[in-house]
Amino acid sequence: MDSQQEDLRFPGMWVSLYFGILGLCSVITGGCIIFLHWRKNLRREEHAQQWVEVMRAATFTYSPLLYWINKRRRYGMNAAINTGPAPAVTKTETEVQNPDVLWDLDIPEGRSHADQDSNPKAEAPAPLQPALQLAPQQPQARSPFPLPIFQEVPFAPPLCNLPPLLNHSVSYPLATCPERNVLFHSLLNLAQEDHSFNAKPFPSEL
């Protein structure tokens, strides 16, 4: 009797153990799925933040160069934008771009001395300020491909050398072009020529 009861309890223990292991595996699988989904969302947010930073750096314009740099950095390659040194603005350029300042500086010396003698207590003149301020020049990136240059045709063929569309065409005003005698063979003309040719006897018949 005791052995039979032990045999009945033994399969029930294995069944409970089986369902327990199955539940544990399902819990572990669900936890892994939730973790991978959370990690995927986290990476998506990081990529979106990086894209926002790239767009802000590119001043909201699509830049193939920035896209190329980001692509290289993703694969572990170092890349940077080489803009080169900024061009320095020379004095001659400022003088050419601000001609009003030159007109203000061209003051006769005698007039200035006379004004100082007449007004000894006059205040010192304020330094001249240019009316226009030069904006910082940005270096322009030159493309490696040359720009296409389209040249016009130096001359066009005269209308006289072109065949007329009509007898009185607009292309020939006032009949300036010479008339051309073109022989057009019609069926009637060919029939008349054939008749005249048959009417003449051959020399052998004579």
Swiss-Prot record:
Cellular compartments per GO CC: membrane
Protein name: Testis-expressed protein 38
Location in or out of the cell: Membrane
Pfam families according to UniProt: THEG4
Keyword Membrane part of the UniProt annotation: yes
Keywords assigned by UniProt, alphabetized: Membrane, Transmembrane, Transmembrane helix
Gene (UniProt): TEX38
Principal subcellular localisation of the protein: membrane
Record membrane topology: Single-pass membrane protein
Residue ranges crossing the lipid bilayer per the database entry: 15-35
Disulfide bond found in the keyword field: no
